[in-house]
Amino acid sequence: MPENATVTGSLVLQRVTKCYGIAKDQQVAAADEVSLTVEAGEYAALTGASGSGKSTLLHLIGAIERPDSGTVTANGVEVTALRGGPLAAYRRTVGFVFQRYHLLPALTALDNVIAPVLPYRTNWSKRDRGRELLTAVGLAGREQSLPSRMSGGEQQRVAIARALVNSPSLLLADEPTGNLDSRNAAEILELLAKLRGRSGMTIILATHDAQIAARCDRLVRLRDGAVVDDIDLSGGYPAEEVIRRVGQLG
């Protein structure tokens, strides 16, 4: 299997379906025949009500879960067909940021960042990479801080640095500002935009917040696991129309 299953080219979902059992002999489709193409370098927002399938779609794209049917293809390689080493290699090209930071409380900010680093890197190069990323996310000088000594916004910055430690070509962010106040949320969004500008990576962000969605290049609205809107925002799409559409979450 090719080793270039990365999102340096288009990310293509074709009729992707994922169902979960909610009771005996009863299933619900969290992703329902989703077909979607995300171009390399795009900043796309997935919106929809709670339970609309945003998180499930991110998990399927990141190969955390497998679809029941349909395919996910990255850079021309079918991710859903990968196993073993090639699958692990693909997962390393994907960074995840979640609403909850999931930092290890006994580790410093630096050690949290470098925890996922590939084992073949030397300890020195790992720590250099960690310091570089902490500086990039605005936490220079906080390398030895424990999570308990950091604000929510600072902890989310550490989580973003950790997600970037293996230089992913795709960043999947699941409600990354959900636990933050408005000031910290705005700073995190600005940080993501800057990091994307520097690296050219693709970002897919799940959010129910219209103001956040309006910052993206692309709006994909989900309802009951299906795509109901797919709008290009890069050409100056009116923010008020984004807000109206995201407001139609039901």
Walk through the language-model features, giving the residues of each:
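Pre-NBD coupling/linker segments of ABC/ABC-like ATPases
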Residues: 1-5
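ABC family nucleotide-binding domain
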Residues: 9-11, 15-215, 222
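Conserved beta-strand-loop-alpha-helix hinge in the C-terminal portion
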Residues: 226-250
